[in-house]
Each structure stands twice: as structure tokens, then as C-alpha cells.
Amino acid sequence: HITLQLIHKTPKDTKMITEKLEKAINYQFNRELFSEYYYLSMASYFNAEGLSGFENFFLVQVEEERFHAMKMYRFLNEKGGRVTLDAIEAPKTEFKSPMEVFQLAFEHEKLVSGLINDLMDLAI
């Protein structure tokens, strides 16, 4: 027999984050979720190609992106913000070669790093 106990948390009266920063963190949160999806697509490609080492590399990236997203989720909630979930666009699923996958992953990482830098600039 399992007993479920619900704990009601009182809504925060004071938001400890600006609307602009909340919106920017939510945007980045959703980019991290897309990145997770994108790298999962890349892992799937390598699985289909029989390249399990490369597949595993991208599965590790999948977990890392989820970890980043969840840090933002917790931060927004701790600061009285509200997490918004946007639709996740379908990532590219067909690749010409392993080299193309790594080139795309590198370009994507540069993009996401730039977004993080912009977020830091906004926060300070």
C-alpha cells in the first residue's frame, strides 16, 4: 500500500528575477532542450552506421544538455520565475558522413556558447 503525501508550497510573493532575465533564461532553457534533441539525432545516426563509440559520445552530450536545462529550470523556480516550454523543432536527422555530424555539432556548440555569453552579459 503506497501513501502519497502532497506538499503545498506557498507561491513566492516576491520575484527575485527581472522579466527580461526570466525570458532570456527560458529561451536558453528551450535551446538546451533542443540541443538534447539534436544530439540524440546524431547519436541515432551513429547507431545506424554501426559506430557505437561515436554514438556513446553523443549520448553523453544528450545527458549534459539535459543537465544544463534542469539547472535553468531549478534556478527559475528558486527565484520565483516561471518556466515556459516551447515547441521543440525537429532536428536534422539525415547526415552525409560522420565528419558532417561533428562539424554541425561544433557549429551548434559555438552558437549555444554565444547564447550563454549573452545571457551572462544580461545577468550582470
Mark where each language-model region is:
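Iron-associated oxidoreductase/ferritin-like identity signal
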Residues: 1-124
